[in-house]
């Protein structure tokens, strides 16, 4: 039997709510159809935003939403997306399917979406093909409340008060689709552009996010920080966060693998690659420690998730994929890693929110379904804003094939402001249940809530015909002990226990 020892007396780092953030790009059916259907649609909506989608996202307690990209961000010109919709310029979405982008969803619509969801804003600016002036004027348009050309233009377009821009990304993937830059060149451009991302209101500052590495490109991290911090140590390289992007491709980049047709070996390969996130955080974090030992700069994992071969019969540029119990495990594993490293990881964004990659929601016409990933993130929402607790897992062992060994169990534990402890655990075994003895430092805790996402079939997923095949359910396979609880975790499972005195 595995043993999980929890020391609730040792509170570690705060798990920022933004770790549970999301990403929505002008890609496929994420924005259009998935979120925004327009005011004249027969699908129920408020100011063009699907009511069913917004309600589901509010249940999820989405803390922050990144927009408009992604690769789309570095070819997006924000002024084309304001003013009367019939007068907005159209453009080609060159990265994603070559479709026509009519710009009917722009700055005002994004801010309205965030208002309806109740989340913070994360706007990604165009450094790759845009000018310093364009970026500066966008920030002025959104955040300045006095008299200025851009503030006046915002008012003319119907929004008197400025918005709060919580985070601003100065470019995206500038090592690739955002300009194919070298780290030194990008860092110098970052220093220049961010100068004009003005904080007009120090009482509600906009935090600036610098473009970080793709996967294991430690050379990029070192080069960017070395240049950004040059003669700027006291300003932490002019940044509040440094991004990291990592996707799980079971079979590789060219042929990624099916979302629903896989065997046990590919199951373990996928989970092993999900676990690689911890190595990336530790190694990039070690480089960040050289320049920022006090951890003033947050690691921002603002693109993560599974990326499979798109569903047969769909546009390859739309990145539409199904979502199984395997994805639920990937989500649970990854979120536990983020929690464990919340001293450095301050924000993350699952890619993407609706109809693209590892979505939490899928839509088809007026229908909407919640994916297994949605249900995991719904359980894990209790970690938001809580304090990570010291926890040690022993005796669990490993499972998998010779090439793709994974730990049988992963976990993280937190305590909220009311003293309620949240334990989230994953059983990575595709066939065997696992018993876990949970011990706490103090007695008197009782289970006040227990939930599970699982299915005996590792391929199980939700469809529009069967939307509740994999869902969140009450969990009863536990027994309270004198100073803890014994749990029997089914195979392929993600569980949450809530403990209180």
Placement of each model-derived feature along the sequence:
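Histidine-centered active-site/metal-ligand motif
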Residues: 245
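Active-site His/acidic residue clusters
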Residues: 248-268, 314
